[in-house]
C-alpha cells in the first residue's frame, strides 16, 4: 500500500514488551509511553496476519527487550508460518547466547544487537549493567548459528563519541556484517538526554573518506559506506531530517494495542485494543483490523517535511 505522500508501507515493527534488563539513559522506547501492557501471542499474530493483506512482508521485533518474552520463539515461528519473507529482531544481546540457536530454528532471519560501547566501563555507564562480555558472547553465537546479516547498533552521544572508531575496529574483528551509527533523538528517554546529542557530520565525513563505496538505502534513504574490510557502516540521522521521513516504510504495533504511524507522533495512532479483546469472531476481528490499517495508512504522514 502507498500512503498519500507516495511512501510504500512494507515493514511492521512490533514492540513485544516495555520491560528491559538494561537502563540505557537515551532509550527511545519505540516512541511509546505508559503502562507495560503486553499483547498476547495470539493478538500479535492476528495483527500480523491482517498486515500481510497490505503487502507488508517484513517484521521487526523490538522492546523493551524482546528476549524477555517467554513466548518469543513461538511468536517468531508463527510469523514465519504466516509467510513473512523477513523476520528480524533488535536485542541488547544479554540473553542471546542461550537463545540464538532456538531463534534460528524458529525462523528468525537476522538480528540487530545494540552495543553502545567498546569497553566495560563505558558500557556500564550507558546501560547500568556490567554485561559487556556477555553481550559479545551473544553476538558471536548469533554469527555462529547464521542469524545473518548480524548488525550492531551504536547510538552516538557525548559519552561514547570517542569510541566510535574503535567500535568499527571491534566490529570488523568480530566478523559482523554491518553496523548502524545512530543519532540520538528526542524520543522516549531521549527527550531528557538530548543534551548528550552529538552531531554525526564529522564522523560520517571521515567514514566516507576511508570507504571504497557509497550506497543509498531505500529505507529512510540512509547512506551506507562499504569499508575495505567489507564491513558496511550505515549512518542513521532521523532528527529534523525530511529525507529520512520521506523514505519511511514502517508502521508500528505498540505493546498496548495501537497502530502507531510515526515514531515521533502520539496523535497519529489507531487504538485496536478493543478489537483484539472484544468478543468477536476471528473473521470479524480481521475485517475490523483491516479497516484500522486502512485508516492508519490514510493518516500516515512524515513528521519532518520539506519546507517549500
Swiss-Prot record:
Binding site for [4Fe-4S] cluster 2: 245, 248, 262
Summary of the function given for this chain in its UniProt record: Catalyzes the cyclization of GTP to (8S)-3',8-cyclo-7,8-dihydroguanosine 5'-triphosphate.
A molecular function (GO) term: metal ion binding
Source organism of this protein record: Saccharolobus islandicus (strain Y.N.15.51 / Yellowstone #2)
Domain Radical SAM core span(s) in chain numbering: 4-224
Reactions performed catalytically: GTP + AH2 + S-adenosyl-L-methionine = (8S)-3',8-cyclo-7,8-dihydroguanosine 5'-triphosphate + 5'-deoxyadenosine + L-methionine + A + H(+)
Pathway info: Cofactor biosynthesis; molybdopterin biosynthesis
Protein's name in the database: Probable GTP 3',8-cyclase
InterPro entries linked to this entry: Aldolase_TIM, Elp3/MiaA/NifB-like_rSAM, MoaA_arc, MoaA_twitch, MoCo_biosynth_MoaA/MoaC, rSAM
Signal peptide (from-to): none
NCBIfam families per record: moaA_archaeal, PRK00164.2-1
Homology family: Belongs to the radical SAM superfamily. MoaA family.
Annotated positions binding S-adenosyl-L-methionine: 64, 114
Cofactor note: Binds 2 [4Fe-4S] clusters. Binds 1 [4Fe-4S] cluster coordinated with 3 cysteines and an exchangeable S-adenosyl-L-methionine and 1 [4Fe-4S] cluster coordinated with 3 cysteines and the GTP-derived substrate.
Keywords: 4Fe-4S, GTP-binding, Iron, Iron-sulfur, Lyase, Metal-binding, Molybdenum cofactor biosynthesis, Nucleotide-binding, S-adenosyl-L-methionine
Annotated EC: 4.1.99.22
GO BP term, pick one: Mo-molybdopterin cofactor biosynthetic process
Source lineage: Archaea, Thermoproteota, Thermoprotei, Sulfolobales, Sulfolobaceae
Cofactor dependency: [4Fe-4S] cluster
Amino acid at each position: 500500500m502507498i500512503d498519500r505522500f507516495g511512501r510504500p508501507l512494507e515493514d511492521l515493527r512490533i514492540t513485544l514488551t516495555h520491560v528491559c534488563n538494561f537502563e540505557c539513559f537515551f532509550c527511545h522506547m519505540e516512541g511509546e509511553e505508559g503502562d507495560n501492557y503486553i499483547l498476547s501471542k495470539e493478538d500479535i499474530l492476528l495483527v500480523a496476519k491482517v498486515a500481510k493483506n497490505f503487502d507488508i512482508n517484513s517484521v521487526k521485533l523490538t522492546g523493551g527487550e524482546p528476549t524477555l518474552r517467554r513466548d518469543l520463539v513461538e511468536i517468531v515461528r508463527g510469523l514465519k508460518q504466516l509467510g513473512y519473507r523477513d523476520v528480524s529482531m533488535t536485542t541488547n544481546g544479554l540473553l542471546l547466547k542461550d537463545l540464538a540457536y532456538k531463534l534460528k530454528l524458529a525462523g528468525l532471519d537476522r538480528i540487530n544487537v545494540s552495543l553502545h560501547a567498546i569497553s566495560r566501563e563505558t558500557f556500564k555507564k550507558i546501560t547500568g549493567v556490567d554485561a559487556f562480555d556477555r553481550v559479545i558472547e551473544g553476538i558471536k553465537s548469533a554469527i555462529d548459528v547464521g542469524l545473518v546479516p548480524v548488525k550492531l547498533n551504536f547510538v552516538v552521544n557525548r559519552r561514547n563519541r570517542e569510541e566510535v572508531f574503535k567500535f568499527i575496529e571491534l566490529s570488523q574483528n568480530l566478523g559482523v556484517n554491518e553496523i548502524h551509527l545512530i543519532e540520538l533523538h528526542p524520543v522516549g528517554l531521549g527527550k531528557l538526554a538530548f543534551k548528550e546529542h552529538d552531531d554525526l557530520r564529522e564522523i560520517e565525513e571521515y567514514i566516507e573518506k576511508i570507504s571504497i563505496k557509497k550506497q543509498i538505502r531505500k529505507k529512510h534513504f540512509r547512506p551506507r559506506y562499504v569499508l575495505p574490510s567489507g564491513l558496511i557502516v550505515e549512518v542513521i540521522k532521523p532528527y529534523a531530517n525530511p529525507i529520512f521521513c520521506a523514505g519511511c516504510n514502517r508502521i508500528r504495533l505498540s505493546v498496548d494495542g495501537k497502530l502507531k504511524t510515526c515514531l515521533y507522533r502520539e496523535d497519529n495512532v489507531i487504538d485496536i485494543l478493543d478489537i483484539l479483546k472484544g468478543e468477536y469472531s476471528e473473521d470479524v476481528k480481521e475485517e475490523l483490523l483491516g479497516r484500522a490499517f486502512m485508516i492508519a495508512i490514510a493518516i500516515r504522514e512524515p513528521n519532518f517535511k520539506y519546507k517549500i
